[in-house]
UniProtKB/Swiss-Prot annotation:
Its cofactor is Mg(2+); Ni(2+). Keywords: ATP-binding, Hydrolase, Magnesium, Metal-binding, Multifunctional enzyme, Nickel, Nucleotide-binding, Nucleotidyltransferase, RNA repair, RNA-binding, Transferase, tRNA processing. HAMAP family: CCA_bact_type1 (MF_01261), CCA_bact_type2 (MF_01262). Comprises two domains: an N-terminal domain containing the nucleotidyltransferase activity and a C-terminal HD domain associated with both phosphodiesterase and phosphatase activities. The lineage of its organism: Bacteria, Pseudomonadati, Pseudomonadota, Gammaproteobacteria, Alteromonadales. This is Multifunctional CCA protein. SUPFAM superfamilies: Nucleotidyltransferase, Poly A polymerase C-terminal region-like. Belongs to the tRNA nucleotidyltransferase/poly(A) polymerase family. Bacterial CCA-adding enzyme type 1 subfamily. ATP binds at G8, R11, R91, R137, R140. Magnesium is required for nucleotidyltransferase activity. InterPro entries: CCA_bact, HD/PDEase_dom, HD_domain, NT_sf, PolA_pol_head_dom, PolyA_RNA-bd, tRNA_CCA-adding_enzyme. It comes from Shewanella piezotolerans (strain WP3 / JCM 13877). It comes from the Bacteria. The keyword Magnesium applies. CTP binds at G8, R11, R91, R137, R140.
Length: 408
């Protein structure tokens, strides 16, 4: 029995990045031998075991053979005679196919270290094409390692394009696609995930609502980048700079889906695009079982981002109605999320990346003033029943109006 550290831990140590998880591969062992040493088996499809003390994962070396469509259509051989190189051969990228023994010796049969140094994401073998999930994984790695200068090898992109055209992506479950989407949103450059999917043709298959934005023009006066799809990825890039909150990043990604529904005769204008996008957002979220928190914020941002952009022109009563509709009184954190998404939208335009966004502080001032209105004072003044709500709203409008007057 021989044990090797494999995959991400070896890769990240070579990149001098923090190591999150350590995965081990065991060569020359049987499940019975592992169990006899106190390991606990957890893998159903192939033998994976938890170490009795560290709870880290130890997988028997294995080979895989394609038997059906989709990422799960494989038969697995985890016999004791499977070699280290055979196991590494089945892995997706060369940078993930490096092993290290307990003496620190590295085994790199597919030149992963050279590709790490060259900042290349390259597939290990043509078996890459057998697993459609790898399209999403490579796009995610491209986003994760974008700041380090990584690019996708041309021959790997060609295979990703072939997979996208094959119909295999449709075999992926919604849960698997969403897991990769959410992981990509966590990266420093989530926009790269979607630009890679666009380049290889996977965006049109998996996220047609986003793909439909490319080629849709916007008014050049406000959007020098013109293209709605380009704008969307610029907004996501800005959202990642402004916030680590994946809900904010997701809302920023889908805030303009309605622009794809604008009548051709009205282009490049997009009247009511925020409201037109609401059914598209609901459908996308239902399809991928997106968490309710993400969905609700995305709907709010799509519905209200134009109002926030025009905040200084809104009447005081309109601002209070916005606060009521969004239930900011009970969910004040949602206001912060909305404003961050709107700021990302404003900055996600060519030449506007460093522009201030005074609307955010203005709306925050309005909300603070309105929040300071005391319900107790209204009740103590003798108001009862429905009058309390009416007077509360009236007092909040007056408080916001005072903020407006002070700014004029």
């Amino acid at each position: 029995m021989k044990i090797y550290l494999v995959g991400g831990a070896v890769r990240d140590s070579l990149l001098e990045l923090p190591i999150k998880d350590r995965d081990y591969m065991v060569v020359g062992a049987t499940p019975e031998q592992m169990l006899a040493q106190g390991y606990k088996q957890v893998g159903k499809d192939f033998p994976v075991f938890l170490h009795p003390k560290t709870q880290q994962e130890y997988a028997l070396a294995r080979t895989e053979r394609k038997t059906a469509a989709g990422y799960g259509g494989f038969s697995v051989d985890a016999a004791p005679n499977v070699t280290l190189e055979q196991d590494l051969l089945r892995r997706d990228l060369t940078i993930n196919a490096i092993a290290q023994d307990d003496q620190g010796n590295r085994y790199d049969p597919f030149n992963g270290i050279a590709d790490l140094n060259a900042r290349l994401l390259r597939h290990v073998s043509d078996a890459f094409i057998e697993d459609p999930l790898r399209v999403l994984r490579v796009a995610r790695f491209a986003a994760r390692f974008h700041s380090l200068g990584f690019n996708i090898a041309a021959e790997t992109m060609a295979l990703m394009t072939k997979i996208s055209q094959s119909g295999e992506l449709e075999a992926l479950t919604a849960e698997r696609v969403y897991i990769e989407l959410d992981k990509s949103l966590t990266s420093d450059a989530p926009q790269v995930f979607f630009s890679v999917l666009k380049e290889c043709g996977a965006l049109a298959v998996l996220f047609p609502e986003i793909d439909a934005l490319f080629g849709i023009p916007q008014p050049e006066q406000w959007h020098p980048e013109i293209d709605s799809g380009v704008h969307t990825l610029m907004v996501l890039e800005q959202a990642a700079k402004l916030s680590n909150d994946n809900a904010v990043r997701f809302a920023s990604l889908v805030h303009d889906l309605g622009k794809a529904l604008s009548p051709k005769a009205s282009l490049p204008k997009h009247h009511g695009h925020g409201q037109k996008g609401l059914p598209l957002i609901k459908a996308l979220c239902e399809r991928f079982r997106v968490p309710n928190e993400y969905r609700d914020l995305a709907l709010l941002v799509s519905d209200q981002h134009q109002n926030i952009h025009n905040a200084h022109e809104l009447r005081a009563d309109t601002i209070v109605k916005l606060f009521d509709k969004a239930d900011f009184w009970r969910k004040p954190h949602r206001l912060e999320q909305l404003l961050l998404s709107c700021e990302a939208d404003a900055k996600g335009r060519t030449g506007f990346e460093l522009s201030p966004y005074p609307q955010a502080s203005y709306i925050q001032q309005c909300f603070k003033a309105a929040s300071n209105v005391s319900v107790k004072d209204i009740i103590d003044a003798g108001y009862k029943g429905a009058e309390i709500r009416q007077q509360l709203t009236s007092s909040r409008v007056e408080a916001v109006q005072e903020i407006k007057l002070n700014l004029e």
